[in-house]
Amino acid sequence: MSYPFSGYDIGVLVMTSWVPKPMGHISQAGNYNFPVYYYPVDSTNTTNIHGGDKAILPDLITAAKHLEEMGCKCITSSCGYFAHFQKEIAEAVDISVYLSSITLIPFLIPMLRKDEKLAILCYNKEKLNMELFHSCNVSKKMLERCIIQDVIHEKEFSNIIKDQGHYNITNARKELVDITKDMKKNNNIGAFLLECTDMPPCSYYIQKELNVPVFDATIMVKFLNTIYGRKNK
């Protein structure tokens, strides 16, 4: 197959959102020393993506096929709740699909000692249902090794969904550090996994404070590029 241009190994399905994209956010192109192809899907919003509304699936598949046609070798997304559509989109294209950091759970569980837990920090844990986990090949047995905490009631992070029109990353950072400190205080945590793509700008501070590895969608993109963007050098 011939392409109109080349060099975009990673493609990102982008949910429409007003939230700023600081360094660390998956949709901040300045994070990467390699090109990333961003493709906005106009019919998406926090309601239908977080809720896994199958009515938008045709639009998502069309967008994924566009990324494939443009030469992308791997597709991810700008919101962790795209995981609702992981299975269907993976079946619809002939390139690799990792729509959410949730797809990392089967990779992370084996690294834990038997007495350790994987702490998952998400926006709204009610939206992380078993259908979503199954779509990402995450079993109930794996989830027994996990602790899930959300931030939906935190003042700064709740501004994202409530469309308040303002978002203070410094305050959000403090919220996340405080939450993760409490989680670690009461549990033997071997690693943190951040579902929400608005959280990675805070990953460094969480890891520095707790001295525990923190995995997120932005790190996942960099990892995927080492594979799909491998160079002969």
Where do the protein language model's features map onto the residues?
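Charge-patterned, long linear interaction tracts outside catalytic cores
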Residues: 165-204
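Non-catalytic positions within long, well-ordered alpha-helices that form the structural scaffold/packing
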Residues: 68-71, 109, 184-185
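C-terminal and late-domain segments of enzyme folds
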Residues: 2-6, 189-201, 207, 218-233
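N-terminal glycine-rich anion-binding loop in soluble enzyme alpha/beta folds
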Residues: 1-55, 124-167
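Glycine-rich, highly charged phosphate/nucleotide-binding loops
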Residues: 50-66, 171-179
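Gly/Ser/Thr-rich loops at beta-strand to alpha-helix junctions
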Residues: 18, 74-85, 98-104, 123-127, ...
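Short, acidic/small-residue loops that bind anionic groups at enzyme active sites
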Residues: 90-112, 207-225
